[in-house]
Amino acid sequence: MPKVGMQPIRRQQLIQATLTAVDQVGMGDASIALIARLAGVSNGIISHYFQDKNGLIAATMRHLMNALIQNVRERRQALTEDSPRAHLQVIIEGNFDASQVSGPAMKTWLAFWATSMHHPSLHRLQRINDHRLYSNLCCQFRRTLPLEQARNAARGLAALIDGLWLRGALSGDAFDTEQAQRIAYEYMDFQLAKSAS
Protein backbone atom coordinates (compact mmCIF):
# COMPACT_ATOMS: atom_id res chain seq x y z
CA MET A 1 0.00 0.00 0.00
CA PRO A 2 1.44 3.41 -0.97
CA LYS A 3 2.39 5.83 1.76
CA VAL A 4 -0.01 8.73 2.27
CA GLY A 5 1.33 11.96 0.79
CA MET A 6 3.91 10.28 -1.44
CA GLN A 7 2.22 11.04 -4.76
CA PRO A 8 3.37 14.69 -5.07
CA ILE A 9 6.86 13.74 -3.92
CA ARG A 10 7.10 10.82 -6.37
CA ARG A 11 5.71 12.87 -9.24
CA GLN A 12 8.25 15.65 -8.63
CA GLN A 13 11.03 13.08 -8.27
CA LEU A 14 10.09 11.55 -11.64
CA ILE A 15 9.86 14.95 -13.34
CA GLN A 16 13.34 15.86 -12.08
CA ALA A 17 14.65 12.48 -13.26
CA THR A 18 13.10 13.13 -16.69
CA LEU A 19 14.87 16.50 -16.94
CA THR A 20 18.14 14.81 -15.98
CA ALA A 21 17.64 11.94 -18.45
CA VAL A 22 16.83 14.27 -21.35
CA ASP A 23 19.86 16.38 -20.44
CA GLN A 24 22.10 13.30 -20.41
CA VAL A 25 20.86 11.29 -23.40
CA GLY A 26 18.11 13.22 -25.21
CA MET A 27 14.38 12.60 -25.38
CA GLY A 28 14.59 9.60 -27.70
CA ASP A 29 16.98 7.67 -25.46
CA ALA A 30 15.41 8.78 -22.18
CA SER A 31 13.71 5.44 -21.60
CA ILE A 32 11.27 4.60 -18.83
CA ALA A 33 13.96 2.32 -17.37
CA LEU A 34 16.58 5.10 -17.32
CA ILE A 35 14.20 7.65 -15.82
CA ALA A 36 13.08 5.15 -13.17
CA ARG A 37 16.71 4.32 -12.35
CA LEU A 38 17.61 8.01 -12.00
CA ALA A 39 14.59 8.51 -9.74
CA GLY A 40 15.43 5.42 -7.71
CA VAL A 41 12.05 3.78 -8.33
CA SER A 42 10.67 0.83 -10.28
CA ASN A 43 9.49 1.18 -13.89
CA GLY A 44 5.94 0.47 -12.77
CA ILE A 45 5.80 3.65 -10.70
CA ILE A 46 5.98 5.72 -13.91
CA SER A 47 3.04 3.80 -15.38
CA HIS A 48 1.16 4.21 -12.10
CA TYR A 49 1.52 8.00 -12.01
CA PHE A 50 1.77 8.95 -15.70
CA GLN A 51 0.52 5.96 -17.76
CA ASP A 52 3.44 6.11 -20.20
CA LYS A 53 6.44 8.14 -21.31
CA ASN A 54 4.29 10.69 -23.15
CA GLY A 55 2.32 11.29 -19.97
CA LEU A 56 5.56 11.86 -18.09
CA ILE A 57 6.87 14.20 -20.81
CA ALA A 58 3.61 16.17 -20.69
CA ALA A 59 3.87 16.45 -16.90
CA THR A 60 7.49 17.58 -17.20
CA MET A 61 6.51 20.26 -19.71
CA ARG A 62 3.64 21.43 -17.51
CA HIS A 63 6.22 21.70 -14.71
CA LEU A 64 8.46 23.94 -16.88
CA MET A 65 5.49 26.00 -18.10
CA ASN A 66 4.22 26.47 -14.54
CA ALA A 67 7.70 27.60 -13.47
CA LEU A 68 7.59 30.18 -16.28
CA ILE A 69 4.12 31.38 -15.25
CA GLN A 70 5.20 31.62 -11.62
CA ASN A 71 8.36 33.56 -12.51
CA VAL A 72 6.39 36.11 -14.51
CA ARG A 73 3.71 36.34 -11.80
CA GLU A 74 6.30 37.01 -9.07
CA ARG A 75 7.98 39.67 -11.17
CA ARG A 76 4.62 41.34 -11.88
CA GLN A 77 3.78 41.41 -8.18
CA ALA A 78 7.09 43.16 -7.49
CA LEU A 79 6.45 45.90 -10.07
CA THR A 80 6.38 49.44 -8.75
CA GLU A 81 4.78 50.83 -11.91
CA ASP A 82 1.92 49.65 -14.10
CA SER A 83 3.23 50.72 -17.50
CA PRO A 84 3.04 48.44 -20.55
CA ARG A 85 6.84 48.63 -20.76
CA ALA A 86 7.26 47.35 -17.20
CA HIS A 87 4.85 44.46 -17.81
CA LEU A 88 6.52 43.55 -21.11
CA GLN A 89 9.92 43.58 -19.41
CA VAL A 90 8.83 41.04 -16.79
CA ILE A 91 7.47 38.76 -19.52
CA ILE A 92 10.82 38.95 -21.30
CA GLU A 93 12.74 38.37 -18.06
CA GLY A 94 10.55 35.40 -17.15
CA ASN A 95 11.23 33.73 -20.49
CA PHE A 96 14.98 34.05 -19.90
CA ASP A 97 14.83 33.07 -16.22
CA ALA A 98 17.33 30.47 -14.97
CA SER A 99 14.50 27.93 -14.68
CA GLN A 100 14.04 28.16 -18.46
CA VAL A 101 17.66 28.38 -19.58
CA SER A 102 19.36 25.68 -17.50
CA GLY A 103 20.88 22.84 -19.54
CA PRO A 104 18.21 20.28 -18.61
CA ALA A 105 15.34 22.75 -19.17
CA MET A 106 16.66 23.92 -22.54
CA LYS A 107 17.25 20.40 -23.84
CA THR A 108 13.80 19.34 -22.65
CA TRP A 109 12.14 22.34 -24.33
CA LEU A 110 13.96 21.62 -27.60
CA ALA A 111 12.99 17.95 -27.53
CA PHE A 112 9.42 18.86 -26.59
CA TRP A 113 9.07 21.24 -29.54
CA ALA A 114 10.23 18.54 -31.94
CA THR A 115 8.11 15.82 -30.35
CA SER A 116 4.99 17.99 -30.12
CA MET A 117 4.67 17.97 -33.91
CA HIS A 118 3.88 14.25 -33.78
CA HIS A 119 1.86 13.86 -30.57
CA PRO A 120 -1.52 15.63 -30.33
CA SER A 121 -1.49 15.96 -26.52
CA LEU A 122 1.97 17.54 -26.57
CA HIS A 123 1.01 19.72 -29.56
CA ARG A 124 -1.93 21.00 -27.52
CA LEU A 125 0.43 21.98 -24.69
CA GLN A 126 2.69 23.77 -27.15
CA ARG A 127 -0.24 25.71 -28.60
CA ILE A 128 -1.36 26.72 -25.11
CA ASN A 129 2.14 27.96 -24.30
CA ASP A 130 2.42 29.89 -27.59
CA HIS A 131 -0.99 31.45 -27.15
CA ARG A 132 -0.26 32.46 -23.56
CA LEU A 133 2.92 34.30 -24.57
CA TYR A 134 1.26 35.99 -27.54
CA SER A 135 -1.87 37.07 -25.63
CA ASN A 136 0.13 38.44 -22.69
CA LEU A 137 2.34 40.45 -25.03
CA CYS A 138 -0.60 41.63 -27.13
CA CYS A 139 -2.53 42.75 -24.05
CA GLN A 140 0.33 45.05 -23.03
CA PHE A 141 1.04 46.40 -26.51
CA ARG A 142 -2.71 47.02 -26.92
CA ARG A 143 -2.57 49.50 -24.05
CA THR A 144 -0.63 51.92 -26.27
CA LEU A 145 -0.95 50.72 -29.87
CA PRO A 146 -3.89 50.25 -32.26
CA LEU A 147 -5.12 46.65 -32.41
CA GLU A 148 -3.37 45.53 -35.60
CA GLN A 149 -0.08 47.16 -34.60
CA ALA A 150 -0.34 45.55 -31.15
CA ARG A 151 -0.92 42.14 -32.71
CA ASN A 152 2.05 42.53 -35.03
CA ALA A 153 4.28 43.81 -32.22
CA ALA A 154 3.25 40.83 -30.06
CA ARG A 155 3.93 38.36 -32.88
CA GLY A 156 7.31 39.95 -33.51
CA LEU A 157 8.36 39.99 -29.86
CA ALA A 158 7.19 36.40 -29.32
CA ALA A 159 9.20 35.30 -32.36
CA LEU A 160 12.22 37.27 -31.15
CA ILE A 161 12.04 35.73 -27.66
CA ASP A 162 11.76 32.23 -29.13
CA GLY A 163 14.51 32.93 -31.65
CA LEU A 164 16.93 34.35 -29.09
CA TRP A 165 16.16 31.44 -26.79
CA LEU A 166 16.72 28.93 -29.60
CA ARG A 167 20.03 30.50 -30.65
CA GLY A 168 21.16 30.49 -27.04
CA ALA A 169 20.14 26.86 -26.59
CA LEU A 170 21.94 25.71 -29.73
CA SER A 171 25.10 27.82 -29.38
CA GLY A 172 26.92 25.37 -27.13
CA ASP A 173 28.13 28.29 -25.01
CA ALA A 174 26.71 29.62 -21.77
CA PHE A 175 23.43 31.41 -22.47
CA ASP A 176 23.96 35.18 -22.33
CA THR A 177 20.56 36.09 -20.92
CA GLU A 178 21.51 39.73 -20.41
CA GLN A 179 22.29 40.13 -24.11
CA ALA A 180 19.07 38.32 -25.09
CA GLN A 181 17.03 40.56 -22.80
CA ARG A 182 18.75 43.68 -24.12
CA ILE A 183 17.91 42.75 -27.73
CA ALA A 184 14.29 42.00 -26.78
CA TYR A 185 14.02 45.31 -24.87
CA GLU A 186 15.27 47.22 -27.92
CA TYR A 187 12.56 45.66 -30.08
CA MET A 188 9.96 46.32 -27.38
CA ASP A 189 10.99 49.99 -27.10
CA PHE A 190 10.96 50.36 -30.88
CA GLN A 191 7.37 49.09 -30.99
CA LEU A 192 6.21 51.15 -27.99
CA ALA A 193 7.71 54.30 -29.57
CA LYS A 194 5.19 53.94 -32.39
CA SER A 195 2.47 55.07 -29.99
CA ALA A 196 4.14 58.47 -29.69
CA SER A 197 4.25 59.04 -33.45
UniProtKB/Swiss-Prot annotation:
The answer, when asked if Transcription regulation is one of the entry's keywords, is yes
Which residue intervals are the DNA-binding region?
31-50
Q: Would you say which domain of life the source belongs to?
A: Bacteria
Pathway terms, separated by semicolons:
Amine and polyamine biosynthesis; betaine biosynthesis via choline pathway [regulation]
Q: Which residues form the signal peptide?
A: none
The record's annotation in PROSITE patterns points to:
HTH_TETR_1, HTH_TETR_2
The terms under GO molecular function for this entry are: DNA-binding transcription factor activity; transcription cis-regulatory region binding
Which segments of the protein form a coiled coil according to its record?
none
Which InterPro entries does UniProt cross-reference here?
Answer: BetI_C, DNA-bd_HTH_TetR-type_CS, Homeodomain-like_sf, HTH-type_TetR-like_transc_reg, HTH_TetR, Tet_transcr_reg_TetR-rel_C_sf, Tscrpt_rep_BetI
Every copy of the HTH tetR-type domain together lies at 8-68
Q: What are the disulfide bonds?
A: none
- Which Gene Ontology terms describe the biological processes this protein takes part in? glycine betaine biosynthetic process from choline; negative regulation of DNA-templated transcription
Which keywords does this Swiss-Prot/TrEMBL entry list? DNA-binding, Repressor, Transcription, Transcription regulation
Protein function: Repressor involved in the biosynthesis of the osmoprotectant glycine betaine. It represses transcription of the choline transporter BetT and the genes of BetAB involved in the synthesis of glycine betaine.
**Name of the protein described by the UniProt record:** HTH-type transcriptional regulator BetI
Q: Which organism does this sequence originate in?
A: Pseudomonas syringae pv. tomato (strain ATCC BAA-871 / DC3000)
